[in-house]
Amino acid sequence: MKIGIVGAMAQEVQMLADLMQDKRVTQVASCTIYEGMIHGKAVALLQSGIGKVAAAIGATLLLEMCKPDLVINTGSAGGVATGLNVGDIVISDETVYHDADVTAFGYAKGQLPACPARFQSDEKLVQLAEKIAVQQQQQVKRGLICSGDSFIQGGTPLAQIKADFPTVMAVEMEATAIAQVCHAFNVPFVVVRAISDSGDGEASMSFEEFLPLAAKQSSAMVLEMIDNL
């Protein structure tokens, strides 16, 4: 088995890259791919860059070049559900674009043509992540994660996302693009992210301050998943 892992930013993949043995590094376009062994498991680790297009380019390269059997998306997210705090873990049941709208042609909000209304995460991976979070005594929630090419800082954008997707737990900028690529390639995926901010008016300051904590928390979760796959 080969495990694929995707993070957008250097801080979100560095801990795992540092643990990798027999490491081979490939730079393609704006993406960096690390291949090697982590705790005796074959891993392909991608730093994709930020945003949906970068994530889709990177995920496609990862799946074509490295042929992983599954993909875990790691990193940080803005927590918008009640009860989520900085450092808590969110696990995707499903993902959707909050900035896609083809409803004029009868599609659901967030749905693109030829795609499902929402991209479903692999249930076995979801359950494994949830089990590990509980074992690590992490605060964890599973549910809907919404993606778009905007850093959400409260106000009208956040209100609109909540109106369109009342069950949304967290917002970020890559997960659904990765999910769409995995769906196209029929590769199981799950999103495991740690909360860095609350998507409100203080989000940018909170993100800068708490990104290292979120990256550490999500990477620790993924490392434990590697050990249990």
From Swiss-Prot:
Gene Ontology biological-process entries: L-methionine salvage from methylthioadenosine; L-methionine salvage from S-adenosylmethionine; nucleoside catabolic process
Enzyme Commission number, as recorded: 3.2.2.9
Naturally occurring in which organism (per UniProt): Pasteurella multocida (strain Pm70)
Gene: mtnN
Protein name: 5'-methylthioadenosine/S-adenosylhomocysteine nucleosidase
Reaction catalysis annotation: S-adenosyl-L-homocysteine + H2O = S-(5-deoxy-D-ribos-5-yl)-L-homocysteine + adenine; S-methyl-5'-thioadenosine + H2O = 5-(methylsulfanyl)-D-ribose + adenine; 5'-deoxyadenosine + H2O = 5-deoxy-D-ribose + adenine
Record-annotated disulphide pairs: none
NCBIfam families, per database record: MTA_SAH-Nsdase (TIGR01704), PRK05584.1 (NF004079)
Family in the record: Belongs to the PNP/UDP phosphorylase family. MtnN subfamily.
Catalytic site positions: E12 (proton acceptor), D197 (proton donor)
One Gene Ontology MF term: methylthioadenosine nucleosidase activity
CDD domains noted in UniProt: MTAN
Keywords linked to the UniProt accession: Amino-acid biosynthesis, Hydrolase, Methionine biosynthesis
A cellular component term, taken from the record's GO annotations: cytosol
